[in-house]
């Protein structure tokens, strides 16, 4: 009987200690009124509805206006893994006729922050081959007005057009190559046996590291740009008599 009595007393004490505290036990000054949470939830819902209903063009324009206020540490460009010969930050436009063999140049006498070091190829060659033509015609230009791009995850992201580096506004340029014409000749690609092959020229892509918008901060992302023009072949069906 005594053992049962002690067991009941112990169970009662444990239940008393485990009982949830009432609001009267909460220290003064730490209670948050329910009206505050209701107002906060209403504000979040309103902001979410506005973000979903805002046109993409308006968002891009707002982001473009904020890029001048984004300051980037120049030491960030010293990391080799972030360098790309097809991405350039410069205060002046690159030359219109860019050389695809040497994308490393100096603008206005000052080297860009993300300049890479590659050996220059000689413009002269001891052997000249006459009558050589590319199967596809391509055009290469520096693009400085890119506002959106597709990242490596297939998501559309905002590209930073301009950034502030050492109190100077640098513009982000991308060296892109694309096909001039999908059919340089009537049969498709140049120099292809049209009797046995179907052919056409198409632009291919690659991913480069670029500065993009991540909320209100700049972030490095892999984005897709046009980088080459290649010939696509498919064998024609053989007609049997």
Curated annotation (Swiss-Prot):
Location in or out of the cell: Secreted; Endosome lumen
Output the SUPFAM superfamilies linked to this UniProt entry.
Cystine-knot cytokines (SSF57501)
**GO CC terms of this entry:** axon; dendrite; endosome lumen; extracellular space; synaptic vesicle
Q: Which GO terms describe its biological process?
A: cell surface receptor protein tyrosine kinase signaling pathway; modulation of chemical synaptic transmission; negative regulation of neuron apoptotic process; nerve development; nerve growth factor signaling pathway; neuron projection morphogenesis
Residue sites binding a 1-acyl-sn-glycero-3-phospho-L-serine per the record: 209
Positions annotated to bind a 1-acyl-sn-glycero-3-phospho-(1D-myo-inositol): 173, 209
Chief location of this protein within or outside the cell: secreted
User: Which residues have a glycan attached per UniProt?
Assistant: 69, 114, 166
Q: Which cysteines are joined by disulfide bonds?
A: 136-201, 179-229, 189-231
The superkingdom of the source organism is: Eukaryota
Q: Per its record, what are the GO molecular function terms?
A: growth factor activity; lipid binding; metalloendopeptidase inhibitor activity; nerve growth factor receptor binding
Propeptide spans which residues? 19-121
Give the keywords, sorted: Cleavage on pair of basic residues, Disulfide bond, Endosome, Glycoprotein, Growth factor, Lipid-binding, Metalloenzyme inhibitor, Metalloprotease inhibitor, Protease inhibitor, Secreted, Signal
Segment forming the signal sequence:
1-18
- Which Pfam families does the record match to this protein? NGF
Known role: Nerve growth factor is important for the development and maintenance of the sympathetic and sensory nervous systems. Extracellular ligand for the NTRK1 and NGFR receptors, activates cellular signaling cascades to regulate neuronal proliferation, differentiation and survival. The immature NGF precursor (proNGF) functions as a ligand for the heterodimeric receptor formed by SORCS2 and NGFR, and activates cellular signaling cascades that lead to inactivation of RAC1 and/or RAC2, reorganization of the actin cytoskeleton and neuronal growth cone collapse.
**Family of the protein in this entry:** Belongs to the NGF-beta family.
Assembly, per entry: Homodimer. The homodimer interacts with a single NTRK1 chain. The homodimer interacts with a single NGFR chain. The NGF dimer interacts with a single SORCS2 chain (via extracellular domain). The NGF precursor (proNGF) binds to a receptor complex formed by SORT1 and NGFR, which leads to NGF endocytosis. Both mature NGF and the immature NGF precursor (proNGF) interact with SORCS2 and with the heterodimer formed by SORCS2 and NGFR (via extracellular domains). The NGF precursor (proNGF) has much higher affinity for SORCS2 than mature NGF.
Protein name (database record)? Beta-nerve growth factor
Name of the gene: NGF
